[in-house]
A protein has these predicted regions:
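Conserved PLP-anchoring active-site segment centered on the Schiff-base-forming lysine
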Residues: 107-129
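Conserved glycine-rich beta-strand-loop-beta hairpin in the small C-terminal domain of fold type I
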Residues: 280, 296-307, 318-332, 366
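N-terminal small-domain helix-loop-helix segment of the aminotransferase-like
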Residues: 4-96, 103, 270, 282-286, ...
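Helix C-cap/helix->beta junction micro-motif
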Residues: 24, 132, 192-193, 223, ...
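Active-site phosphate-binding strand-loop segment of PLP-dependent enzymes
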Residues: 137, 142-213
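PLP-dependent enzyme catalytic core of the Aspartate aminotransferase-like
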Residues: 80, 155-156, 337-339, 347-356, ...
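Conserved core segment of the aminotransferase class I/II
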Residues: 218-297, 307-309, 392
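A short helix-loop-beta submotif of the ANL/AMP-binding
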Residues: 131-137
Length: 398
C-alpha cells in the first residue's frame, strides 16, 4: 500500500500551502484543526500540577496496557458509561486515540476485508484501515436527518467480507450526537451480521443543549465492542497524547483478535507514562470542561456565533452542531460554480488568508461542504466569517 495515496487532509495540501504562506510572512487565521491550547484553552491546574509531581516516578516503561491507577480510573469511568463485562485487562492506554485506532486496524484487517466507516468521517479511520490492507466502505450520514447514519445505506453495503462498523459519536466533523434509538438500530444491524463495533467517543464530555451521550457498547452486551476516548479534547491537552480503548461485551467471540491486540500493544512497549499519571486526577477531579459547554461558556457561545454567522451568508446552510467544536456547512455549488472543494479552500486561503478543510478531507463524496473549527474566540470567528462573506460575494470558481 502506497502511503502517499492515502488522504489525511486535516493536515494535507491546503494546510501545506498555508504553512508556505506563513513562511513568506503572511498571518493565517486557522480554522482547520481541533487543538484547543493555541486558542487560549488550558488544562485544569490540578492536572498540570499532578503531572509535574509525577514526572520523577514516570521515567521508566509501564505495563504495555498502562499504569494501574490510569486503568483503574478508566474502568470506573466505563462503569459510569455502563459498558458491560469490562475488567482491568480490557483497558489499553495509548499515545492518543489515534495510535489505538491504528493498532486496532492492523490487528483486524487482512487484504480484501471490508469495514464500514461513516461519510463524512474523521479521516484517520479511513487512512489506517486502508493502510492495514482493508477495503473501506463508506456509509452515508444524512444531513437532512441531523447527520444521523442512514440505516438503509448501511444495510445495502454489508457483504460477506464485512468485518466491522465504525461510528463516531459525538461526531467529527458534523457535531452530531446520536440518540439511543439510532444506536439501537446500529446494534441490531451489527447483531444480524456479527460485526465488531468500533465507537470513537473522544468528544463524549463536550455535549451541549441538554443532549445526552450514550455509549453504544452499553446497548450491546452480546456483541464485541471497542470504545475509544481520552483527555485531549475534554481536558484541552491534545499535546500530552493520552487516550484509551476499552474492550467490552462478547470478548469470547474475539479471542484471536484480542491476542493480536495484545501482541501489537506489547510491540510498541507502552504509551507515555507522564501523561498516564494524570488520568486518575483528570477523570476524578473537577470537570472544568462543563463551564465551556453551558450558556455563557466559550465553546457554547462560539458554537452559537459561528452557526448564525455562517447561515447568514447567502449560499451557506448548516445543521447546528450539538457537541465537540466543529461545524460542517454546506455551500451552494451551483451558485458559486464549485466543482472542486479543495480548490475552493485554496482560493479562499490565497485571497483572505483563512484556513478551512474541504469536505473531501473527510471522505465526503461531493464538493459542497467544508469544516470549520470554532475554537477561536468570537472576535476571530467574526473576522473569519466576514472574510468568507466578502470572498463569496464575488466568487465563481473557474
Amino acid at each position: 500500500m502506497c502511503i502517499r495515496d492515502r488522504l489525511y487532509d486535516v493536515r494535507g495540501p491546503v494546510v501545506d500551502e498555508a504553512a508556505r504562506m506563513e513562511e513568506d510572512g503572511m498571518e493565517i487565521l486557522k480554522l482547520n484543526i481541533g487543538n484547543p491550547y493555541p486558542f487560549g484553552f488550558s488544562a485544569p491546574q490540578e492536572v498540570i500540577l499532578d503531572m509535574l509531581s509525577n514526572v520523577r516516578t514516570s521515567q521508566g516503561y509501564s505495563d504495555s496496557k498502562g499504569i494501574f491507577s490510569a486503568r483503574k480510573a478508566i474502568m470506573q469511568y466505563s462503569q459510569l458509561k455502563k459498558l458491560p463485562n469490562v475488567t482491568m485487562s480490557d483497558i489499553y492506554t495509548g499515545n492518543g486515540v489515534s495510535e489505538l485506532i491504528n493498532l486496532c486496524m492492523q490487528a483486524l484487517l487482512n487484504n480484501g476485508d471490508e469495514i464500514l466507516i461513516p461519510s463524512p468521517d474523521y479521516p484517520l479511520w479511513t487512512a489506517t484501515a486502508t493502510l492495514a490492507g482493508g477495503n473501506v466502505v463508506h456509509y452515508i450520514c444524512d444531513e437532512q436527518s441531523d447527520w444521523y447514519p442512514d440505516m438503509d445505506d448501511i444495510r445495502s453495503k454489508i457483504t460477506d467480507r464485512t468485518k466491522a462498523i465504525v461510528i463516531i459519536n459525538p461526531n467529527n466533523p458534523t457535531g452530531a450526537v446520536y440518540p439511543k434509538e439510532v444506536l439501537e438500530q446500529i446494534v441490531q444491524i451489527a447483531r444480524e451480521h456479527e460485526l465488531i463495533i468500533f465507537s470513537d467517543e473522544i468528544y463524549d464530555r463536550l455535549v451541549m443543549d441538554g443532549y445526552e451521550h450514550t455509549s453504544i457498547a452499553s446497548l450491546a452486551p452480546d456483541l464485541f465492542c471497542v470504545t475509544f476516548s481520552g483527555l485531549s479534547k475534554s481536558h484541552m491537552i491534545a499535546g500530552f497524547r493520552i487516550g484509551w480503548m476499552i474492550l467490552s461485551g462478547a470478548k469470547n467471540k474475539a479471542k484471536g483478535y484480542i491476542e493480536g491486540l495484545n501482541m501489537l500493544s506489547s510491540m510498541r512497549l507502552c504509551s507515555n507514562v507522564p501523561a498516564q499519571s494524570i488520568v486518575q486526577t483528570a477523570l476524578g477531579g473537577y470537570q472544568s470542561v462543563n463551564e465551556y459547554i453551558q450558556p455563557g461558556g466559550r465553546i457554547y457561545e462560539q458554537r452559537d456565533y459561528i452557526y448564525k454567522a455562517l447561515t447568514d451568508i447567502p449560499g451557506i446552510t448548516a445543521v447546528k452542531p450539538r457537541a465537540a467544536f466543529y461545524i460542517f456547512p454546506k455551500i451552494d455549488t451551483e451558485k458559486f460554480n464549485i466543482m472542486d472543494d479543495e480548490q475552493f479552500a485554496l482560493d479562499f486561503l490565497h485571497e483572505k488568508q483563512v484556513l478551512l478543510v474541504p469536505g473531501k478531507g473527510f471522505n465526503w463524496g461531493q464538493p459542497d461542504h467544508f469544516r470549520v473549527v470554532y475554537l477561536p474566540n468570537v472576535r476571530q470567528l467574526e473576522k473569519a466569517t466576514d472574510r468568507l462573506r466578502e470572498f463569496l460575494s464575488t466568487y465563481h470558481q473557474r
